[in-house]
Structure formats: structure tokens, C-alpha cells
């Protein structure tokens, strides 16, 4: 009887080990990937931007703002996309943020959190973005069962806990300096997208301090509109290489700005 138990036990143990091995990647896959986008609303009064129409450049009005509620603003563009579903909006997690939107990808277990910062609070928007890039102050955001990818309640990792962080808006570092940079820890694996004018020059030092890697940023003047951001995110979701993601971003920018693909490739770059 003892001999039989040993012989039968071996396959049982093997089966259990095999099932455990399968369960580990499945459990990892069940955790949603998150993207946190920090948007500084365009503001004719408080930012050194080329003035735009008064309605588009009102930094206190996210609904009609150039970088948020307009056709190519982050909220409107993603809400109209066939790839994303807006599952929550209107939240104001802190005073500087006039609106928070949460989007769920329709086919992948990926969520996007987008925060619209009051135009006059652009410095805070940039500091919060850099802190997130450094992995600091992670935020937990609960998602209701009816709006989650799994059909059950889940919690999203945002800010310093997000998998990818992005900034979109005016390059405020052209107007002011930061007294200190958020410091990342060794082994920081965050990637960052910075859609702002000449961001590779102005954000280089603070981004190095965070330890994050620049996935897409810019070498010249640009329109930080959402089509470029979405195209880069599309590639990131598919686990494409940094160069492939940058190529997507450049192609999208050329499509809308008609600047020529060669010019878009010079403008939008990846890495240091």
C-alpha cells in the first residue's frame, strides 16, 4: 500500500505544481496595467503660450479647454475613441485638479487616469508628474464591479504606482525653475511620455533625477494634442519597442499636423 501511495503521489504532485505554475502568470495578468496622464490646461493668462482663442485658453474651464475638452483634448479625444470607454469623470481629488477622468480599454485590461490641472497650477502639475515618474506617493483608486475589466471590484494603481506616466501641456519649465526634483529609487522602471515644447531639453535634468526612462518626448515646438499620446499608448499596450512606439507617435503627429514624417521623427524622439 505504501508503494502504491508513492507512485500515485508523484503524478498528483506534478499536476499540482503544473497548475500552480499556470496560476502565477494568470494572477499577474489579472492585475490591470495603469497609465496616469497629467494635463496642464492651456491658460492665456498664466502661461507663456502663444495666445489661443479665449475659450480654448481659459485655464479655469476644462470643458472647452484646448488640451482637455476640445476636439483634440485628452478627455474628448479618448472619450470618442473606439478603443476606450469613459467610465468615470468629474472627480476632483485635490484643489488643483478641476476634473479627473478614468478610461478603460475595450479589449485589454488597461486603465487610463487623466487629471486636468487648473492652468495657473501648471507648476504643481509638473511636480506631481515628476513625483509619479519617481514612483513617489502612489495612489489607489477603487473601480466599481460594473465598470471593471474583470466584472468585479478592483483597485487601480495611480500616480507613483502607475505603470506609465505622461505629461501633456505647455512646457512650464521654459517659464520657471523647480527648486528641487523628486528623487527616484534605484531600480525605478517607470517610463514617461512628455508632450510639451522642447521637453527633451527642459525636462532632462528633473527626469534623470526621478530615475524614469523617457519613452517619447520632444526636441522642438509642438502641439501637445491627444492623438500623439493615444498613438504612443497604443504601442505601449502591445508591448512594442520604444522605437516602434516613437514611430507611431511621429506618424500620428504628421497625420494631423501635416509636417512631414521626417520632421515628425526629428521632433518626437525616445531615450536619452
Task: Label the model's feature ranges.
Residues 2-14:
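Bacterial N-terminal signal peptides that target proteins for export
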Residues 12-23:
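Bacterial N-terminal signal peptides
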Residues 25-30:
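Boundary at the C-terminal end of the N-terminal hydrophobic targeting segment
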Residues 31-61, 106-112:
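Acidic/histidine-rich, surface-exposed loop or edge segments in extracytoplasmic proteins
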Residues 62-158:
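Functional beta-strand-loop-alpha-helix junction segments that form "active/interaction loops"
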Residues 155-235:
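Catalytic cores of nucleophile-dependent amide-cleaving enzymes
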Residues 216, 236-245:
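A polyampholytic, Gly/Pro-enriched intrinsically disordered region
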Residues 244-272:
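Caspase-like cysteine protease fold
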Amino acid at each position: 500500500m505504501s508503494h502504491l501511495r508513492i507512485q500515485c503521489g508523484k503524478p498528483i504532485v506534478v499536476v499540482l505544481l503544473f497548475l500552480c505554475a499556470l496560476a502565477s502568470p494568470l494572477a499577474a495578468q489579472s492585475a490591470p496595467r495603469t497609465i496616469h496622464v497629467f494635463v496642464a490646461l492651456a491658460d492665456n493668462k498664466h502661461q507663456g503660450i502663444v495666445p489661443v482663442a479665449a475659450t480654448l485658453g481659459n485655464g479655469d474651464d476644462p470643458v472647452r479647454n484646448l488640451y482637455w475638452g476640445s476636439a483634440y483634448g485628452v478627455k474628448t479625444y479618448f472619450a470618442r475613441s473606439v478603443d476606450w470607454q469613459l467610465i468615470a469623470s468629474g472627480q476632483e481629488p485635490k484643489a488643483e485638479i478641476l476634473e479627473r477622468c478614468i478610461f478603460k480599454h475595450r479589449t485589454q485590461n488597461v486603465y487610463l487616469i487623466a487629471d486636468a490641472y487648473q492652468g495657473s497650477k501648471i507648476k504643481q502639475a509638473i511636480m506631481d508628474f515628476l513625483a509619479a515618474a519617481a514612483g513617489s506617493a502612489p495612489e489607489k483608486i477603487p473601480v466599481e464591479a460594473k465598470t471593471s475589466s474583470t466584472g468585479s471590484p478592483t483597485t487601480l494603481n495611480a500616480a507613483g504606482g502607475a505603470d506609465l506616466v505622461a505629461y501633456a501641456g505647455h512646457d512650464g519649465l521654459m517659464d520657471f525653475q523647480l527648486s528641487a526634483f523628486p528623487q527616484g529609487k534605484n531600480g525605478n522602471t517607470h517610463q514617461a511620455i512628455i508632450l510639451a515644447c522642447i521637453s527633451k531639453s527642459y525636462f532632462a535634468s528633473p527626469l534623470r533625477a526621478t530615475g524614469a526612462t523617457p519613452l517619447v518626448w520632444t526636441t522642438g515646438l509642438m502641439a501637445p494634442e491627444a492623438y500623439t499620446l493615444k498613438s504612443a499608448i497604443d504601442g505601449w499596450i502591445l508591448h512594442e519597442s520604444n522605437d516602434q512606439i516613437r514611430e507611431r507617435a511621429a506618424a500620428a503627429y504628421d497625420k494631423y499636423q501635416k509636417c512631414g514624417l521626417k520632421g515628425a521623427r526629428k521632433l518626437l524622439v525616445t531615450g536619452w
